[in-house]
Amino acid sequence: MLMLLLPIGLFGCGAKKKYTSADVSAISFSCSSMSYTDSYIYSLKKENEEWFFDANYSYDFENPRVEFENKKVSTQDAAAILEAVKEQDLILQAQKYKPPRIKAFVLDGGGYYLYFKMNDGTEIKAEIYNENLVNVLRTLAEKCR
């Protein structure tokens, strides 16, 4: 019986910890693009039980680029973003993300990057896009302007 447990002990304990949106201490989502008018980065971070929001974005040629850092946001605003993370199961998606084996670089292509920092210091990164998350982040950015 011990011989059967040994392989399980050696190989079965590599499961990733299951995190929830309550474990998030920072989230960042960005789009890089060759077009300066269609790029953005949003970051929400928790410090001493308060939430702070950074944004740097532009969506068209007619409106100026918006940039700000460390805007204090309400717990409700932070909760709306974390709810989108929870509803879309973005933490698990990011944990399951595997970068492509073939490294191809397209000069005019954009890239989407999602980053989480958890309360225990674990960092989770993925190149994934989620429209719902973009919408709640953009809504908060417009509110903070």
Where are these regions (language model features)?
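Short amphipathic beta-strand/extended segments with alternating polar/hydrophobic composition
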Residues: 41-45, 67-76, 121-131
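Solvent-exposed, well-ordered amphipathic alpha-helical segments
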Residues: 46-50, 87, 109-112
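A short-motif feature that recognizes glycine-rich, charge-decorated loops
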Residues: 57-93
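N-terminal export/targeting and maturation segments
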Residues: 13-63
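Sec-dependent bacterial lipoprotein signal peptides
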Residues: 1-11
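Short, well-ordered, aromatic-rich surface patches in folded extracellular/luminal domains
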Residues: 13-34, 95-145
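Polar/charged alpha-helical tracts
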Residues: 18, 42-43, 47, 76-83, ...
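Phosphate-binding glycine-rich loops and adjacent basic patches that engage nucleotide phosphates
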Residues: 37-49, 74-77, 95-106
